[in-house]
């Protein structure tokens, strides 16, 4: 966790003071700087760019350098400190714990070495023991801002038989620049810091009771003459926390507790990528997968029933059946016939546009978006398959019905992408229909091959593509809005293929949202045509091509979404009259 945890004390002589703090070091220390739980030395590094971080970076130095660094330390001078303001003895190097899992080091000093961090901790210390106090002056509170960091502070009292009111005022603070993270960590920090405080108070209470039992001070205090000036009691008003708790290893224990607190709090909350609700494509794919699983289960059950009902085979029949198996269906023949995929394939929509030409590609894309049947005739089945793989990215998953390669024509209601071999005859009414487009792939002539260039460099140059349709309106009309935006992205050479793909995904999501609104408006609510026209104008889809596109894409909505809408409409709350 990128934070600082500090123990603060309100001294009767010097006011709020920072006693002990633990910070996180993300940079590895050189050899000799200490490893594990041990002592180490540090000096402030150069200020990091990009704002203040809740950690600093240190490097090892010699004792002579440590002395010079101590003289230039941002902390208070020795003359301004008493026993109650000081935690580590003069020349104490501090504590370092090394987390081998994350290569992070937790370093504890009395003050942060970085001047800006010292200022932040100092200000938080003063505010936690002066103005930012919860009712009762003992308990947790949250304060801070973007400039000086956000602070979780828990104030508490420690028993002292020589102090005013027999107690001294302390606080444990956790400083972080991330407000949301600190607020979310409130319950965890409150419980763990409260445990540290209870342990300190328990040790101090035992010392207090022992001192009171050995030498009661209450009568002496009550008889002391009043004076408006601060003065020491029994010559030692400023007692260190180690003497109050009678624990010489107190600071080492606090270092361990603070280091564990920083590590545990950082490991407790982790960032996760929230993808939101599943898209329509995801829902449709899940439904298709479920249907395939149901079909496979039904086939397995039917085969099991046939085996149970069938007569017992004579001895040796299984061997004869295996020998009758045709060579085409054997696994060995399939593996032997496997070859690497050919290079004569389309790689992307931009590649297809370059090969077909802008006018032919626009005609083809228009028919794809409108839901018309797209027929490819070629001897190369891999080429047809790659063309369909590229073209299907323009449509939602639910609108795609593909027959990759067939030896006979299939009707449009069965597929909107159909691959045929060259000898297959297409019915005349389909060729003349405005709801179909045919792409015929021919072998290029010798002259065109030399004109285009080397066949090995451009494998698709050995083909000629002829795009025909019974309706030439695709090239004449303005076309659907999504087609115009798509062509603008494809023609922009500053956009890479990956960026164009993401742009296409965003365009499909935008128009699928419009499809959902139109479906809810027309199919579920059954609004009149006048209201539907107003809605289309608001959606920016009042043109004829846009309306056709929305109606076709409506068929690609998932069954889950449709059933959810219908169940919502039929619920009692939905049947209440509208105000």
UniProtKB/Swiss-Prot annotation:
The modification Phosphoserine is found at residues 62, 73, 302, 406, 537, 542, 571. GO terms for molecular function: enzyme binding; enzyme inhibitor activity; GTPase activator activity; protein-containing complex binding. GO terms for biological process: cell proliferation involved in kidney development; cell-cell junction assembly; cellular response to amino acid starvation; cellular response to starvation; energy homeostasis; epithelial cell proliferation; ERK1 and ERK2 cascade; hemopoiesis. Residues 294-308 have a biased composition (Acidic residues). It comes from the Eukaryota. Residues 86-242 form the uDENN FLCN/SMCR8-type domain. Interacts (via C-terminus) with FNIP1 or FNIP2 (via C-terminus). Component of the lysosomal folliculin complex (LFC), composed of FLCN, FNIP1 (or FNIP2), RagA/RRAGA or RagB/RRAGB GDP-bound, RagC/RRAGC or RagD/RRAGD GTP-bound, and Ragulator. Interaction with FNIP1 or FNIP2 mediates indirect interaction with the PRKAA1, PRKAB1 and PRKAG1 subunits of 5'-AMP-activated protein kinase (AMPK). Interacts with HSP90AA1 in the presence of FNIP1. Interacts with HSP70, STUB1, CDC37, AHSA1, CCT2, STIP1, PTGES3 and PPP5C. This is Folliculin. It comes from Bos taurus (Bovine). The lineage of its organism: Eukaryota, Metazoa, Chordata, Craniata, Vertebrata.
């Amino acid at each position: 966790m990128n934070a600082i945890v500090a123990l603060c004390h309100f001294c009767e002589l010097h006011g709020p003071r920072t006693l002990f703090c633990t910070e996180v070091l993300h940079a590895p220390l050189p050899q000799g700087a200490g490893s594990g739980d041990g002592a180490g030395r540090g000096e402030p590094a150069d200020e990091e760019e990009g704002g203040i971080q809740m950690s600093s970076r240190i490097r090892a130095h010699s004792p002579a350098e440590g002395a010079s660094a101590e003289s230039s330390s941002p902390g208070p001078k020795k003359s301004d400190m008493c026993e109650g303001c000081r935690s580590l003895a003069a020349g104490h190097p501090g504590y370092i714990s090394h987390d081998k899992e994350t290569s992070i080091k937790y370093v504890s000093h009395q003050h942060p070495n970085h001047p800006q961090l010292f200022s932040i901790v100092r200000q938080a210390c003063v505010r936690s023991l002066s103005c930012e106090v919860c009712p009762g002056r003992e308990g947790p509170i949250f304060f801070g801002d973007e400039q000086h960091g956000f602070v979780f502070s828990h104030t508490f009292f420690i028993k002292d038989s020589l102090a005013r009111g027999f107690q001294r005022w302390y606080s444990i603070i956790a400083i972080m620049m991330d407000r949301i993270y600190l607020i979310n960590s409130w319950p965890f920090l409150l419980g763990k810091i409260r445990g540290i405080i209870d342990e300190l108070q328990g040790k101090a209470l035992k010392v207090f009771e022992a001192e009171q039992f050995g030498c009661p001070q209450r009568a002496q205090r009550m008889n002391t003459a009043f004076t408006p000036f601060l003065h020491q009691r029994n010559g030692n008003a400023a007692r260190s926390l180690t003497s109050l708790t009678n624990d010489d290893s107190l600071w080492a224990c606090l270092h361990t507790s603070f280091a564990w607190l920083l590590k545990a709090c950082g490991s407790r909350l982790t960032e996760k990528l929230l993808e939101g609700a599943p898209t329509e494509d995801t829902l449709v794919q899940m439904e298709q997968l479920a249907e395939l699983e149901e079909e496979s289960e039904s086939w397995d059950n039917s085969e099991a029933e046939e085996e149970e009902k069938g007569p017992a085979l004579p001895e040796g029949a299984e061997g004869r059946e295996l020998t009758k198996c045709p060579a085409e269906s054997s696994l060995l023949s399939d593996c032997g016939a496997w070859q690497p995929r050919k290079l004569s394939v389309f790689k992307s929509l931009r590649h297809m546009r370059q090969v077909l030409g802008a006018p032919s590609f626009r005609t083809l894309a228009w028919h794809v978006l409108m839901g018309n049947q797209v027929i490819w005739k070629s001897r190369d089945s891999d080429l047809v398959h790659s063309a369909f793989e590229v073209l299907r990215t323009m449509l939602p998953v639910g609108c795609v019905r593909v027959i990759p390669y067939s030896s006979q024509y299939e009707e449009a209601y069965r597929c909107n992408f159909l691959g045929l071999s060259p000898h297959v005859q297409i019915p005349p009414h389909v060729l003349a229909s405005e709801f179909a487009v045919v792409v015929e792939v021919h072998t290029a002539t010798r002259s065109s091959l030399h004109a285009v260039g080397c066949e090995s460099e451009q494998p698709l140059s050995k083909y000629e593509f002829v795009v025909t349709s019974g309706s030439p309106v695709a090239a004449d009309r303005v076309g659907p809005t999504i087609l115009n935006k798509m062509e603008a992205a494809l023609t922009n050479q500053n956009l890479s293929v990956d960026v164009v793909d993401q742009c296409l995904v965003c365009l499909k999501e935008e128009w699928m949202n419009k499809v959902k609104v139109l479906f809810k408006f027309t199919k579920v609510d059954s609004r009149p045509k006048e209201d539907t026209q107003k809605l289309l104008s608001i959606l920016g889809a009042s043109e004829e091509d846009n309306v056709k596109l929305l109606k076709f894409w409506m068929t690609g909505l998932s069954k889950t979404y449709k059933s959810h809408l219908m169940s919502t409409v039929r619920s009692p709350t939905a049947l209440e009259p509208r105000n």
